[in-house]
Amino acid sequence: SEFIYGSLHLFDPIINAEFSPQGVALRQFTSRWEGGMVRTSGNWLRDGKTLILDDAAIAGLEYTLPKNWQQLWMETTPGWLNSLQLKRFSASRNLIIDIDPDFPWQLTALDGYGANLTLVTDHKWGVWSGSANLNAAAATFNRVDVRRPSLALTANSSTVNISELSAFTEKGILEATASVSQTPQRQTHISLNGRGVPVNILQQWGWPELPITGDGNIQLVASGAIQANATLKP
C-alpha cells in the first residue's frame, strides 16, 4: 500500500491510533520512506496543540533535502502544531544530501541519538531544548571531503551549546565548539582548531583565501549574529 500527500510518499504505512476529546494516542506508526524505515509512537494533545513522540527511529534513509528547505525551516508550523517534543530519537545508517549548487553537502552513514528534544515552540522550528549526538562515516561539505564528522549539542531556553564538532580531513583533524543564543539576533560564538590540515581548507566554506599554502595548524575564533528571519548562507 502507498500513501501520498504532496511530496510525502509512504510505502506500507501501519498506523494504530485512538481518538478522544483530549487528542490522539498514536500507539504505533511505521512505514517505509525514502528507501528506509521510520517508526514512532506518542500523543497529540488538543489542549496546547502539542505533539509528543515517545520514541522515534529512522534507519536506512536515502533523503535529498527539498531545494527550499531553508525557507521551510523558517516558516511557521500549521495551527494544529504549536509544539513538537521528542522524548527519544535514534538514527542509523542514513544518507542525507543537499544539492544546493552554492554549497552542496552530504552525510553518509549518519547515526545519532537524542533525548527530550523540543523542535517546535510557538509554531517556530528550532532546537529549543534537549540533547543530541550525531556522527557519520563520511561527509562532503562544498566539495571538501571529511571522515568521521561528529556533533554533540545541548539546548535550553537561552542557548544552544555545541560541545563537540569535529571531523578528520585528508591528513589532519578539525575540532570546534560553538554557542548560539535563542534570541531573535542569534548571537553566535565559534572556536575552531585545526591540526595538520590544509591551511586554506576553510576557503571552500566561505573564508577569504590566505596568502600561504601547504599544511599546518590553524586557530579561528569568531563571533557574530545569525538573524532568525534570514536564510542560512555559506
Q: What are the functions of these language-model segments?
A:
Residues 27-29, 41-43, 165:
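A structural feature that tracks compact, well-ordered secondary-structure segments
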